[in-house]
Regions:
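Active-site-proximal alpha-helix that buttresses catalytic centers in soluble enzyme cores
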Residues: 1-243
Length: 243
């Protein structure tokens, strides 16, 4: 099931393919006689859409013998920017490794020596879960990934705004930039907000700053990385194992 009706409608119109929304999927589960329900959100974090998913599940919980909801990709949020966890560590390692390989380097250090900074652009949110982006930067720092920076389209948290990230990358002395989405799917935001030709895209803003010799993009979502897929499966298994 998809949580975003606008995407469901778009796929229906474009491909004539029907995808359930949460209520439709839950209705089918009830009609099919499902007793023990396990829900695996494929969201990045505990944000607004995750809350909507939980509300939908809550309305149906009395129609199942048991309902278990697994963690989204980045796991528990935690209280402040300093809080990290094993999920964030795994995502940081897996995403960075994939970006480094795609950029043609043998290691992150080799890319650093060549003056390359990697900028991972998330969506951003006014939801309290926005601290997750700050935590991901903390995680990168703790891993010693000095040339990895976290940004967001919405600029929430404030330090993840495009102009702030440009400033941070330039001040750190990097002359080449690789932009890649910190999103499960590389859709409109990756293709347009990050890599688009409009002057307000991240690609255009990084180039317009005049601070970098090259700015490249990698348009690929987290969901295409095998290790990330495995992490979702592990979250599902953990939920199923709960007593």
């Amino acid at each position: 099931a998809f949580t975003a009706q606008i995407i469901i409608n778009h796929v229906q119109a474009r491909d004539d393919e029907h995808i359930d929304n949460m209520d439709q999927a839950l209705d089918r589960a009830v009609a099919n006689g499902v007793k023990n329900l396990v829900v695996q959100p494929t969201h990045l974090m505990h944000g607004a859409e995750y809350d909507e998913l939980m509300e939908a599940v809550e309305a149906y919980k009395d129609q199942f013998a048991s309902v278990k909801v697994a963690e989204p990709l980045l796991g528990e949020v935690g209280s402040d920017a300093a809080v990290v966890n094993d999920d964030k560590k795994a995502v940081a390692e897996d995403l960075t490794a994939e970006a480094v390989k795609t950029a043609g380097y043998d290691s992150l250090d080799a890319a650093k020596e060549d003056g390359v900074a990697f900028v991972f652009m998330g969506h951003g949110t006014s939801h309290t879960a926005k601290v997750s982006y700050s935590q991901m930067q903390t995680q990168m720092n703790e891993l010693g990934y000095e040339n990895v920076f976290i940004g967001t389209v919405e600029g929430e948290p404030e330090e993840t705004a495009c102009e702030e990230v440009i400033k941070a990358v330039a001040e750190a002395g990097y002359t080449k930039v690789v932009l890649r989405p910190l999103m499960v799917v590389a859709g409109d935001h990756a293709n347009n907000d990050m890599a688009g030709e409009d002057e307000d895209s991240w690609l255009s803003q990084f180039n317009a700053s005049g601070k970098f010799d090259s700015v490249d993009t990698q348009i690929s979502g987290l969901g295409g990385i095998k290790a990330i897929q495995d992490l979702y499966v592990a979250h599902t298994a953990a939920a199923m194992a709960e007593k």
